[in-house]
Amino acid sequence: MRSALRGLLLGVLGTLVLYGCSNPQLIRQRHRAAVYNTELGVAYLQRGELALAKEKLDQAERENPDSPNVQSARALLFERLREPARADHAFHRALELAPRNPDYQNDYAVYLCSSGRYARGVKYFLEAARNPLYLTPADAFDNAGVCLRAEHHDAAAIKMFKTALAINPEFSSAVWELAELDYKHGRLKQAHSELVQYLSTHHETASLLLLAVRVMHAQGDTLDAVLYARRLQLDYPDSPQARALSTLGLNSG
């Protein structure tokens, strides 16, 4: 009797599971819930509430394990949790589900470079940059350059920064990277030209102004160094870059 009852209950349960898996309305409801829980999980992740983020993203995966958005968000979570094996798995799964999504390619590239896998990181940055669906290819080329710099491939990095600037001439971080490399390698005239040209026609940043001070100072151009130092102190008085001026011994006042 008990065996028969157990068999009946298992049969009913199996029928309900199959019904839930095949009912289009229930599937749509679960997928909508997964979208909602993914958004909540990402919001918690951005606020640093990792336990709540994991709870919501685990729930989202149960609701729709084949969503690339869910897998991508989980990859970012596992990266924050310092679980590289699980992060890798989730990144791979997201790219399996959406192999041409440039945002997933870029996110995975950032993760790879931050974990020291530079060559693979550059590969995925370039895939994102060359993807016609990617709205900010200059960012990906710039990121590839930063990744190459971390591996001390400065010549290849310069090409990436120049490509980024060819796409977006207003890209201040690429200008800084390019001029800083020239400064590092003693190409002061080239660094001077890049900085002056940009700062005379585009919006300044504290990092660019400090680099300009250093380049002018290295060239022995004390007057221009002081002028850029003054701009830095006036426009960004509380910045780390303004505080760094004291190490150069310049009197901008």
Where are the predicted features?
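Bacterial Sec signal peptide processing site at the extreme N-terminus
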Residues: T15-N37, G253
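Terminal, low-structured helical/coil segments at or just beyond the last alpha-helical repeat
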Residues: H202-G253
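Structural marker of alpha-solenoid helical repeat scaffolds
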Residues: Q29, E63, L97, N131-L133, ...
